[in-house]
From Swiss-Prot:
It comes from Citrobacter koseri (strain ATCC BAA-895 / CDC 4225-83 / SGSC4696). This is Urocanate hydratase. Binds 1 NAD(+) per subunit. The gene is hutU. GO terms for cellular component: cytoplasm. Belongs to the urocanase family. Its cofactor is NAD(+). It catalyses: 4-imidazolone-5-propanoate = trans-urocanate + H2O. Its main location: cytoplasm. It is found in: Cytoplasm. Its EC number is 4.2.1.49. Catalyzes the conversion of urocanate to 4-imidazolone-5-propionate. Pathway: Amino-acid degradation; L-histidine degradation into L-glutamate; N-formimidoyl-L-glutamate from L-histidine: step 2/3. Keywords: Cytoplasm, Histidine metabolism, Lyase, NAD.
Amino acid sequence: MPQSKYRQQDIRAPRGTTLTAKSWLTEAPLRMLMNNLDPDVAENPHELVVYGGIGRAARDWECYDAIINALTKLEADETLLVQSGKPVGVFKTHENAPRVLIANSNLVPHWATWEHFNELDAKGLAMYGQMTAGSWIYIGSQGIVQGTYETFVEAGRQHYQGNLSGRWVLTAGLGGMGGAQPLAATLAGACSLNIECQQSRIDFRLRTRYVDEQATSLDDALARIEKYTREGKAVSVALCANAADVVPELVKRGVRPDLVTDQTSAHDPLHGYLPSGWRWEEYQAKAASDPQGTVQAAKRSMAKHVQAMLAFSEMGVPTFDYGNNIRQMAKEMGVENAFDFPGFVPAYIRPLFCRGIGPFRWVALSGDPEDIYKTDAKVKEIVADDKHLHHWLDMARERINFQGLPARICWVGLAWRQKLGLAFNEMVRRGEVSAPIVIGRDHLDSGSVASPNRETEAMRDGSDAVSDWPLLNALLNTASGATWVSLHHGGGVGMGFSQHAGMVIVCDGTDEAAARIARVLHNDPATGVMRHADAGYEIAVECAAEQGLNLPMIAATQGKR
């Protein structure tokens, strides 16, 4: 029998050094689960929705209570198993095993459709975990800001001689992921017009300083963009409207942005993309009363949206999919050339993945922002020669408001993750920070995801859909001693289109933690280098050889073995 997914209760993680659980290794997942549902973090916390349509932290409130209860009682040699947001077992393992193992939204491939998943969800038998919602390591929109920033910067390098001043980005979606776009564009030096159909989401981004201002109409928005680009100012403008209407209208008017993308929740047509001409309340009601008709209406609107994006691409405007599967939805509605513009990974990000570079993140369990500022300084000390990274950290401190527990995102690769993790652990040991640090990442990383319309689109060897890689990543992180490990399906692009894994490890200042950190923070990014080397990317082969990886089928890594 389905239990309640709604509770009028605000959740905030404990701060300080007083433990609710029996050790920091179980206190950490407890605090991070609670932090995912902090009103300053989650999109709809009273319904357990963290971000990304219906990406939840727990299946229902009864399951949430049971998870919290289990974590408070968990012993140092026990492991909690969580199945689609429901705690299903506690087993005796050992002290270096993960304290929590999570599997979310996984379906046998033939049944891996939204229709079947929604049936299970309605019966209380499943939960959509997105990527970091159900794996308890979401840190608000900051979690994707740097990745979006790196994408815009690389687009500027490729198309505009590395200078986005006086240029503007057209995009849509200001949810938990899309909400990073306006700030990322501003940090990259560009203006942006950000279309969002829910005023509450615009209010959230204005309050957290991710978007600068809101226009009253499309004409007003364009006037603001024209003024700011003429003045060379990087200002983000939000517009409350439907992208399915506005983007085609801009094509009709002959307006020419400098970059075009989209980050609406198009991956979930039943819950995440407002059909043209509908109000949000109407959409929610019809999703319950006529799900099939609602999905078709949403996908028809997506088709219009993608046709407009294609028109911009044909004008010569750099246009790219930002990983929400909108091209696939449009293709299913008859837009045969929907994939004529690329996804952001093959267009701009893959060379980073080849070196194991991706969204490394950490959180101060103390709740003290000073702990993050001290770790920022430590990153600069260790990665001493990377001016681009130092610039990012300076901008992040100046511009990014913490949401919930203080956190930082920082794209680093195989060469640095282990060193940083060990340094953070030493800071905890010496009392330089006031409580342990947790280190995790997005599932959007170099070796932890198979997603043919996003992270693994257009792989050199054609292995886009091979999902052995995230399974191996999860298994290796478990064997290496991560504090919690997760294996999900459908994140980012929806049911049937992705499989992906996550890990989190606690720096509690002990020697045992140092040994686990050394294994996990080497092996985890190394799987990304391995995956790309196996696909034939020379950058990855070179990185594997430089970092001493042992890849039996890659001659360059064998040396004198």
